[in-house]
Amino acid sequence: MPRVAYSEADRERVRSDLLSAALELMARQGVQHTTVEQIYRAAGISRTFFYTFFPTKEDLIVETFYRQQPRVLARAQSLMADPALTWREGVRQFLRDCCYGERSGIAVMTVEEQRLLFQRLSPESFRTFREKQFSLFSGLLTCFGVPASRENVQLFTNISLTAMVVRRAIPETLPFFVPEAAEATVAFQIEAIADALERMRRDP
Protein backbone atom coordinates (compact mmCIF):
# COMPACT_ATOMS: atom_id res chain seq x y z
CA MET A 1 0.00 0.00 0.00
CA PRO A 2 1.48 3.40 -0.93
CA ARG A 3 2.30 5.78 1.87
CA VAL A 4 0.07 8.79 2.32
CA ALA A 5 1.94 12.07 2.04
CA TYR A 6 0.98 14.45 4.84
CA SER A 7 1.41 18.20 4.56
CA GLU A 8 2.57 20.24 7.54
CA ALA A 9 -1.02 21.36 8.06
CA ASP A 10 -2.14 17.72 8.06
CA ARG A 11 0.51 16.81 10.60
CA GLU A 12 -0.50 19.69 12.86
CA ARG A 13 -4.11 18.56 12.67
CA VAL A 14 -3.19 14.96 13.51
CA ARG A 15 -0.98 16.12 16.38
CA SER A 16 -3.82 18.22 17.75
CA ASP A 17 -6.20 15.26 17.42
CA LEU A 18 -3.77 13.05 19.35
CA LEU A 19 -3.45 15.56 22.18
CA SER A 20 -7.21 16.08 22.34
CA ALA A 21 -7.81 12.33 22.48
CA ALA A 22 -5.11 11.89 25.12
CA LEU A 23 -6.54 14.66 27.29
CA GLU A 24 -10.06 13.27 27.13
CA LEU A 25 -8.92 9.74 27.97
CA MET A 26 -6.49 10.76 30.71
CA ALA A 27 -9.09 12.98 32.38
CA ARG A 28 -11.69 10.21 32.31
CA GLN A 29 -9.64 7.13 33.19
CA GLY A 30 -6.28 8.38 34.45
CA VAL A 31 -2.84 8.58 32.90
CA GLN A 32 -1.75 5.07 33.84
CA HIS A 33 -4.87 3.43 32.41
CA THR A 34 -4.64 5.31 29.12
CA THR A 35 -2.71 3.39 26.49
CA VAL A 36 -0.93 4.57 23.38
CA GLU A 37 -3.17 2.26 21.36
CA GLN A 38 -6.33 3.91 22.69
CA ILE A 39 -4.97 7.30 21.71
CA TYR A 40 -3.80 6.57 18.18
CA ARG A 41 -6.98 4.62 17.44
CA ALA A 42 -9.08 7.56 18.66
CA ALA A 43 -7.13 9.83 16.30
CA GLY A 44 -7.52 7.37 13.42
CA ILE A 45 -3.83 6.74 12.74
CA SER A 46 -1.41 3.82 12.96
CA ARG A 47 0.95 3.02 15.81
CA THR A 48 3.97 3.66 13.57
CA PHE A 49 2.66 7.08 12.55
CA PHE A 50 1.94 7.93 16.20
CA TYR A 51 5.61 7.52 17.09
CA THR A 52 6.63 10.08 14.47
CA PHE A 53 4.89 12.65 16.69
CA PHE A 54 5.76 11.35 20.16
CA PRO A 55 8.75 9.00 20.55
CA THR A 56 7.50 7.85 23.98
CA LYS A 57 4.28 7.85 25.96
CA GLU A 58 5.98 10.19 28.44
CA ASP A 59 6.50 12.78 25.70
CA LEU A 60 2.80 12.61 24.97
CA ILE A 61 1.84 12.92 28.65
CA VAL A 62 3.95 16.05 29.09
CA GLU A 63 2.58 17.68 25.94
CA THR A 64 -0.97 16.77 26.95
CA PHE A 65 -0.58 18.56 30.27
CA TYR A 66 0.90 21.56 28.47
CA ARG A 67 -2.11 21.54 26.14
CA GLN A 68 -4.44 21.48 29.14
CA GLN A 69 -2.96 24.50 30.93
CA PRO A 70 -4.68 27.26 28.88
CA ARG A 71 -7.99 25.45 29.28
CA VAL A 72 -7.58 25.27 33.05
CA LEU A 73 -6.81 28.98 33.21
CA ALA A 74 -9.76 29.77 30.93
CA ARG A 75 -12.05 27.80 33.25
CA ALA A 76 -10.89 29.84 36.24
CA GLN A 77 -11.37 33.08 34.31
CA SER A 78 -14.91 32.14 33.29
CA LEU A 79 -15.83 31.36 36.89
CA MET A 80 -14.38 34.63 38.14
CA ALA A 81 -16.32 36.50 35.45
CA ASP A 82 -19.63 34.79 36.28
CA PRO A 83 -21.89 37.42 37.90
CA ALA A 84 -23.99 34.69 39.50
CA LEU A 85 -21.04 33.53 41.63
CA THR A 86 -19.31 35.18 44.54
CA TRP A 87 -15.50 35.15 44.55
CA ARG A 88 -15.46 32.29 47.03
CA GLU A 89 -18.05 30.27 45.11
CA GLY A 90 -15.97 30.63 41.95
CA VAL A 91 -12.81 29.48 43.70
CA ARG A 92 -14.64 26.54 45.26
CA GLN A 93 -16.11 25.46 41.94
CA PHE A 94 -12.74 25.68 40.22
CA LEU A 95 -11.08 23.52 42.86
CA ARG A 96 -13.94 21.02 42.70
CA ASP A 97 -13.52 20.83 38.92
CA CYS A 98 -9.84 20.00 39.43
CA CYS A 99 -10.42 17.46 42.19
CA TYR A 100 -13.13 15.70 40.18
CA GLY A 101 -11.39 15.96 36.84
CA GLU A 102 -13.06 12.87 35.40
CA ARG A 103 -16.33 14.83 35.51
CA SER A 104 -14.99 18.16 34.26
CA GLY A 105 -12.44 16.94 31.71
CA ILE A 106 -9.35 18.00 33.69
CA ALA A 107 -6.53 15.45 33.81
CA VAL A 108 -4.78 15.06 37.17
CA MET A 109 -1.88 12.72 37.91
CA THR A 110 -1.95 10.37 40.87
CA VAL A 111 1.07 9.98 43.17
CA GLU A 112 2.18 6.86 41.29
CA GLU A 113 1.73 8.52 37.89
CA GLN A 114 3.81 11.49 39.00
CA ARG A 115 6.55 9.19 40.26
CA LEU A 116 6.67 7.16 37.05
CA LEU A 117 6.73 10.26 34.86
CA PHE A 118 9.46 11.90 36.95
CA GLN A 119 11.66 8.81 36.62
CA ARG A 120 11.50 9.05 32.83
CA LEU A 121 11.97 12.80 32.38
CA SER A 122 15.37 14.26 31.60
CA PRO A 123 16.56 17.02 33.98
CA GLU A 124 15.89 19.58 31.26
CA SER A 125 12.36 18.28 30.62
CA PHE A 126 11.66 18.29 34.35
CA ARG A 127 12.84 21.92 34.63
CA THR A 128 10.60 22.92 31.75
CA PHE A 129 7.65 21.11 33.32
CA ARG A 130 8.17 22.90 36.63
CA GLU A 131 8.51 26.27 34.90
CA LYS A 132 5.25 25.77 33.03
CA GLN A 133 3.59 24.54 36.22
CA PHE A 134 4.73 27.66 38.05
CA SER A 135 3.42 29.83 35.21
CA LEU A 136 0.01 28.14 35.38
CA PHE A 137 -0.42 28.50 39.13
CA SER A 138 0.86 32.08 38.97
CA GLY A 139 -1.76 32.82 36.32
CA LEU A 140 -4.45 31.25 38.47
CA LEU A 141 -3.55 33.40 41.47
CA THR A 142 -3.64 36.50 39.28
CA CYS A 143 -7.04 35.42 37.99
CA PHE A 144 -8.25 35.08 41.59
CA GLY A 145 -6.94 38.54 42.46
CA VAL A 146 -4.20 37.15 44.70
CA PRO A 147 -0.64 38.54 44.57
CA ALA A 148 1.42 35.99 42.63
CA SER A 149 4.58 36.18 44.72
CA ARG A 150 6.90 33.18 44.52
CA GLU A 151 5.93 32.14 48.05
CA ASN A 152 2.20 32.38 47.30
CA VAL A 153 2.54 30.42 44.05
CA GLN A 154 4.57 27.69 45.72
CA LEU A 155 2.09 27.31 48.58
CA PHE A 156 -0.94 27.41 46.30
CA THR A 157 0.61 24.75 44.07
CA ASN A 158 1.23 22.40 46.97
CA ILE A 159 -2.08 22.78 48.76
CA SER A 160 -4.08 22.51 45.52
CA LEU A 161 -2.23 19.42 44.31
CA THR A 162 -2.58 17.88 47.77
CA ALA A 163 -6.37 18.06 47.55
CA MET A 164 -6.38 16.66 44.00
CA VAL A 165 -3.95 13.84 44.78
CA VAL A 166 -5.64 12.79 48.02
CA ARG A 167 -9.01 12.63 46.31
CA ARG A 168 -7.55 10.34 43.62
CA ALA A 169 -5.61 8.24 46.14
CA ILE A 170 -8.47 7.07 48.38
CA PRO A 171 -8.72 4.14 48.84
CA GLU A 172 -6.33 2.44 46.38
CA THR A 173 -3.09 4.27 47.21
CA LEU A 174 -4.11 5.30 50.73
CA PRO A 175 -5.95 2.21 52.02
CA PHE A 176 -5.90 3.32 55.65
CA PHE A 177 -7.81 6.51 54.86
CA VAL A 178 -11.57 6.24 55.36
CA PRO A 179 -13.23 6.05 51.92
CA GLU A 180 -16.65 7.01 53.31
CA ALA A 181 -15.19 10.39 54.30
CA ALA A 182 -13.33 10.99 51.03
CA GLU A 183 -15.75 13.60 49.65
CA ALA A 184 -16.02 15.38 53.00
CA THR A 185 -12.21 15.44 53.16
CA VAL A 186 -11.98 17.07 49.74
CA ALA A 187 -14.66 19.62 50.69
CA PHE A 188 -12.73 20.46 53.87
CA GLN A 189 -9.50 20.92 51.91
CA ILE A 190 -11.22 23.15 49.36
CA GLU A 191 -12.58 25.39 52.13
CA ALA A 192 -9.12 25.57 53.70
CA ILE A 193 -7.56 26.55 50.36
CA ALA A 194 -10.21 29.23 49.83
CA ASP A 195 -9.46 30.55 53.34
CA ALA A 196 -5.74 30.69 52.52
CA LEU A 197 -6.36 32.56 49.26
CA GLU A 198 -8.61 35.06 51.05
CA ARG A 199 -5.82 35.76 53.53
CA MET A 200 -3.36 36.24 50.66
CA ARG A 201 -5.76 38.73 49.05
CA ARG A 202 -6.31 40.58 52.30
CA ASP A 203 -2.69 40.67 53.46
CA PRO A 204 -0.51 40.86 50.33
Region roles according to the model:
Residues 70-77, 119-146, 151-158, 180, ...:
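Amphipathic alpha-helical packing segments from all-alpha helical-bundle domains
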Residues 14, 57, 64, 68, ...:
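Hydrophobic/aromatic residues within well-ordered alpha-helical segments
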Residues 1-2, 135-146, 162-204:
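C-terminal peripheral helix-coil segments that are non-catalytic and often amphipathic
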Residues 1-29, 38, 42:
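Basic, helix-initiating cap at the start of DNA-binding domains
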Residues 17, 21-28, 71-79, 159, ...:
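Solvent-exposed, amphipathic alpha-helical segments
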Residues 89, 99-124, 138, 168-176:
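Amphipathic alpha-helical segments used for helix-helix packing
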Residues 63, 77-104, 156-157:
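Hydrophobic alpha-helical connector segments
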Residues 25-59, 63:
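Helix-turn-helix
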